[in-house]
Amino acid sequence: MTTIRNEIEINAPIASVFEYYTNPDNIKESWPREIVKESENVSGQKSEEGSEMKVTGEYMGKRDDMLLEVVDKEQNKKLVTRQTQGPFKRWESVQEFQNGQKNYTRVVHTIEYELPTTGKIGNFLTGSQAEEKIKQGIQQAAQTVKQKLESKSV
């Protein structure tokens, strides 16, 4: 099991940051285009417990879909999604939101995953390659969200 953690402070109200981060449509807008191609809500209310979203990504030249289910949500505090179908043996994403000083919001995003031993992604990515790609993606996504929310271009 590999764990990747990213923290960022965004100069915006917690409600705005939570709303942007937890909208499935924004995943494709914030993650690097070479990793995430599409993202959309596929069942239930957007980002409510039990709802599912589909993220289409590209892993070392191979396109694949990941179905994620929202398994825990606390408004303006936390969103947990887990892969129910997709290229990873296991994938869980935990986004935590905390009120900071002077209208800042602290976001802690932790992804735990396990690569499969077979299949598309298992054949094309080594552990360190996958970790580097995911680390770059989570960092770039956080910076993109920060820029959008701080410039109010949402």
Feature roles, as predicted:
Residues 39-85, 104-106, 139-154:
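Glycine-rich portal/gate segments that line the openings of hydrophobic small-molecule binding cavities
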Residues 10-12, 59-61, 72, 87, ...:
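Beta-strand elements of well-folded, non-transmembrane domains
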Residues 1-43, 48:
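Hydrophobic ligand-binding cavity/cleft-lining segments
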Residues 22, 32, 123-126, 150:
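A generic structural signal for secondary-structure junctions
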Residues 83-136:
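Beta-strand/loop substructures that line and gate deep hydrophobic ligand-binding cavities in soluble
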Residues 12-14, 74-75, 100-102:
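Short loop segments at secondary-structure junctions
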